[in-house]
Amino acid sequence: MTGMRIAFVLGTVTGGTGAHVAMLARGGQARGLAVRVYGPAQAGRQFFPGAPAFVPVEIADRPRLARDAAAVLRLRRLLAGSRPEVVHAHGLRAGAVAAFALAGAGWRRRHRCALVVTVHNAPPTARPAGAVYAVLERIVAHRADAVTCVSGDLAARMRHLGAADVGLAIVPAPPGTAPGSEEVAAARAGLGGAGRPVVLAVGRLAPQKGFATLLAAAASWQHREPGPVLALAGAGPLDQMLRAQADASGIRMRFLGQRGDVPALLAAADVVVVPSRWEGQPLIVQEALRAGRPLVASRTGGIPDLTGEDAAVLVPPGDVAALVAAVLAVLDDPGLAARLSEAARARAAALPGEDAAVDAALALYQRVAGLPTAV
């Protein structure tokens, strides 16, 4: 496999997708692959700073005909120069751009190049974006040699659309070190939870994350004494809306902003809540399991595959009453909290890590490129 040429393509990304591509690129290079990464300059600065293997291609975050056409033409020229054996695109927009770039590549008639697409997110359904993404899904399903998905529901959807070779991607949380006791104590003090239980949520302040549902749930437990403190770590477009919701409801909470000490925050919390409308293999769930924290999360996407039925209390997404009941059950029952913590650590120990993710990707590259795979 040494010297096998792999091109990664990504669009406008935040958080997990960019980190995942960077992990695969590093792992591939460490195993002797010749790697190139194509994507927006913003992604390069955030996830590939100073990497000579990164080449800017501006793939827009929403449909823009002129920019999309320019991205296809630029990527086609770049791929003609590097002639990869496998192109691995991440996301539906990047997958469609890569498919069109390869469709017009004359060099593919002489040099085989396979297309792999990883679907990281559930597409929007509301029009007009939903109609556009439905087309992108079909392009990916019919033109990719293989499709990997971050959850079983996405994989089933791609099979339904006609994709012939569909599997599950492995998207592990990066390895981390446990915070020290002093760091945890400082985090706990900063959460304002002296004498009160702390409910923690972490994520981008965006509609998908379901934080408006969490704040509605928090309004229901304000009458309790000692009432829980809700701490929300993250930044994003809904910041002001969520602050207004908290003020209007009189919620006892702390907006923490973007934080670099999430492991300490997790260790300081009494319960971690992931109220998302949909998720694939969210890093925060994996990090909470690794920290052994009692977890309440939405039963959606790939979350149940990560937690199983014993390492989290799973509730329907958007169900305020169920979320309230689950959080209070954990806070009021030390035995339940202890069982969740023990199951979380066991579950985390069984989850595949970065080496497994890279090995699985490389085995897929060999297969779609028609190369012999190791037995």
Where are these regions (language model features)?
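Short hydrophobic beta-strand element within catalytic cores of glycosyltransferases
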Residues: P294-A297
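A charged, aromatic-enriched C-terminal amphipathic alpha-helix characteristic of glycosyltransferases
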Residues: G335-Q366
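A short, active-site helix/loop in glycosyltransferases that binds the activated sugar's phosphate group
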Residues: H142-G167
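Conserved acidic donor-binding segment of nucleotide-sugar-dependent glycosyltransferases
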Residues: E309-A321, A329-G335
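Short His-centered aromatic/hydrophobic patch
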Residues: A89-G95, V119
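N-terminal strand-loop element at the rim of the active site
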Residues: G3, A7-A69, L78, R157, ...
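Aromatic "clamp/platform" in nucleotide-sugar-dependent glycosyltransferases that forms part
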Residues: Q258, R277
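A conserved mid-protein helix/loop that constitutes part of the nucleotide-sugar donor-binding site
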Residues: G18-R26, P197, A201-S220, L230, ...
